[in-house]
Amino acid sequence: APPQNYLWLQELRKVQELHWSLKDNGLDMFRLDGFVTYTVREPEGRLVSYDLYPPVIEESFEADGTVALIINDGMHRVYLARQEWVVPQVVYVRGVPKAFPYYAYPRPQGWEGLDLLAENPDRHTYLKKCHRIRHNKTLYRDFQAVFKNVGGSRSELNR
């Protein structure tokens, strides 16, 4: 289940372009065994490398006893896979101590009613996620500690 109430169309287009570019180079974004490093040219000409690993799905036990499968990382990729009728290879995380749940709740309605937005919404007027605790970043999974340039916005792909 997605934890986020929207997808950003600009990011979805970048993910789709990355999918096509990787495919042109013999790699399938939805069938990664491990991770791949790719390089993009920023608008000012600088080359920047990024790591890409499969989407991360985390098992989460909710208050009503439901076991939710939260998209921890890779929501735009999972959405694109759904649009292409592909079941993507994922990293499945289970056994997380109950004291350290994912920092936001899964959407009870799943993908239904998810907003596709042209602009990244203002956090003061739009609820991106329903956080579990006030200081939610204390529960954040920091993949940047292991991989290069992950979790941030991707630049336009070098063609």
Give the residues covered by each predicted segment.
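Short alpha-helix boundary/capping and kink motifs at helix termini
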Residues: 1-70, 82-83, 94
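Basic- and aromatic-enriched surface patches that contact anionic nucleotides/nucleic acids
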Residues: 66-159
